[in-house]
Curated annotation (Swiss-Prot):
Residues 28-57 are annotated as: Disordered. It is found in: Mitochondrion. Pfam families: GatB_N (PF02934), GatB_Yqey (PF02637). The lineage of its organism: Eukaryota, Fungi, Dikarya, Ascomycota, Pezizomycotina. Gene3D superfamilies: 1.10.10.410. Allows the formation of correctly charged Gln-tRNA(Gln) through the transamidation of misacylated Glu-tRNA(Gln) in the mitochondria. The reaction takes place in the presence of glutamine and ATP through an activated gamma-phospho-Glu-tRNA(Gln). Disulfide bonds: none annotated. It comes from Blastomyces gilchristii (strain SLH14081) (Blastomyces dermatitidis). Belongs to the GatB/GatE family. GatB subfamily. GO terms for cellular component: glutamyl-tRNA(Gln) amidotransferase complex; mitochondrion. Its main location: mitochondrion. One of its GO terms (molecular function) is glutaminyl-tRNA synthase (glutamine-hydrolyzing) activity. This is Glutamyl-tRNA(Gln) amidotransferase subunit B, mitochondrial. Residues 1-48 form a transit peptide. Subunit of the heterotrimeric GatCAB amidotransferase (AdT) complex, composed of A, B and C subunits.
Amino acid sequence: MIRQCLSRRGAYSRYRLAARGVELAEPFHHQSSRPQGRRNWSSSPRCSLDIRTDTPRSRSEYVPLRKQLKEEAKAKRAAKRKGSAPPAKHDDWELTVGIEIHAQLDTDAKLFSRASAAIDDIPNSNVALFDIALPGSQPLFQPSTLIPALRAALAMNCDIQRVSRFDRKHYFYQDQPAGYQITQYYEPYAKNGSIWLQEHDGIAREDGEGVQIGIKQIQMEQDTAKSQELPSSTYLLDFNRVSRPLIEIITLPQIHSPATAAACVRKIQAILQSVGAVTTGMEMGGLRADVNVSVRKRSEGAGDHEYHGIVGLGQRTEIKNLSSFKAVEDAIIAERDRQIAVLEAGGTIEGETRGWTLGSTETRKLRGKEGEVDYRYMPDPDLGPVVIGEDVICDLQMKMPLLPDALFQMLVRNPKYKLSTADAKTMIELDDGQRLEYYQDVVDILIGLQTDLSADFSGGKAVGNWVLHELGGLLTKSSLPWDSGRVPAQSLAEIIDLLSRKEITSSSAKSLLAMVFDGDKRSVAQIVEDENLRFQSLSRGEYIALAEEVMRQNPKMVSEIREKGQLGKIGWFVGQIKRIGDANRVEAQKAEEILRELILKKNS
């Protein structure tokens, strides 16, 4: 049972929409939060925002991102070669990091209106009156948005609060038409959680085999409009994103290395994806992180500052809007080094907000204490408390899917899969879990195809290699995103089955995969027959003839093998047999056996 106690408010007022300072990316269709029909705003006048900067924008701001990254990486390498940035000494300093993660929930409805939360629709096509803060409109909490948020909190071992409330966080910016964001500052729906990071998660060596990171709280909040800046200093706003449901996950400052911080964000993303709580990961913009960084001298004992109940810390700075795992790690490294350099020079660290640019070597100041915003948090008078029943929590706990740690152990230890540690980790992290689902489908189909071969199935590792490396290589080469329909699981299973039965060679299997990947609609069996890919083994006499020919052409190498014992050169002869013979019919193992027999026998 989930219910919300609604507060009373006067009747709706009728006002004309006056959108000041914004230009809608497209005319939008209003979708009311009340059942009063759909109104078309497509004829509404467009209003533009023209903000002039004090200084002209340089052309470098419009350089393609790929080129910028290449240039920045090149400059970074050059600086290292010149020795202009000697590495800081960190042994005498303790780094402390806390992380705030914002994740888009996977829901059909927005948080406070019945408008669709679809991601890729036409700009400004899913907008309710409340989303654009039309005077008189009220928020209407959608209980369905709480379900993925609860799954996320339970997966991170949080205590679910039976009663939670919403607050207003006041600030003025173009992407927030109401002048405030609705969040859960004082009474969040989940508190006191934790996650466990292990060695395979990529934690720092000094953290040993594992480290536990506390979760202070998880709170629900509404997203803001999507803003696009044009070269003319005009901003286009897409209000589709307003009131999409987010959760903010706040960790305790218990992280002491950049690598472990990145591993923490990576692990939280994997947890959210495993329980179906989020739309996409960091790669697609569905998750972003802010990090709080402080350092203190180990020899001087505890610092003077406190953060989320943890005392004895140094003065912290916050780095906003990090959008990749690498950005999290690199930004923390840069800020750690900056703070150490300032303190060693006799300076002090200011409690400020800083930014980070991908490929940069240092953080940049955004605003200091004097520029900090007073958000004037206050309870939202239009929203009553959210009451969560025990029945809902119990039902979600019973239906909880496997979490990343359990998935990892299953992929590594289950005889059905037997993946390496690296492959298991990669499989879990890729493509929001879709690659893992595809892999499991291929394995299940292959088991069905090979019931006649052996009671002990051992093809899981081979399937992992094909899914991650062969198919993954084709995706990388073609710069295409993951799509399980491009090579159906049935087709890949049939290719691997033919290869394991030695009915086709490895090169033929790769050719088959490439043809299916490129859109060949024929069945795998039909392609094999049409393209004459079925393996026909050479006879012993044919192997001997080929071996004798390559030996006759290379007598010096034969002598080196016989007289000097350079057996490694036999592999070169195998390659020559494949070159002069039919590569699709040559089995390397048989070719090597014949070569050893002919070369070494004559030497005995």
